[in-house]
Curated annotation (Swiss-Prot):
The lineage of its organism: Bacteria, Pseudomonadati, Pseudomonadota, Gammaproteobacteria, Legionellales. Belongs to the UPF0102 family. HAMAP family: UPF0102 (MF_00048). Coiled coil: none annotated. It comes from Coxiella burnetii (strain CbuK_Q154). This is UPF0102 protein CbuK_0265. One of its GO terms (molecular function) is nucleic acid binding. Pfam families: UPF0102 (PF02021).
Amino acid sequence: MFSLTQKIGFNAEKTACRYLQKQGLSFITKNFRYKQGEIDLIMSDQSILVFIEVRYRRFSDFIHPVATVTPLKQRRLIKTELHYLQKHRLLDKISCRFDIVGITADRQITWIKNAIEVEY
């Protein structure tokens, strides 16, 4: 049984995925986990592999969902990305980027491309 928070998260990820597909991205996988990290969506934008963090906030009066990706969360995402690339033997073979999709309770979507800088 899923908690209400998990259901809200799943719905936000589904909404983000549909939105990004309408923008031309292709779905690869979702909820890729490694140790303490998880990448919500992995998609492709032509020849670029896109790792996507989806953030939802019911109350966004004080802070936008996108602003909730902390430096610690960014480090975990990067470690998870590297594991994905190594596992699939893609390291140094494909261009990648990290995007963040923020969704508010009134379904406003903010998509930030290249939101997290990664240096290999």
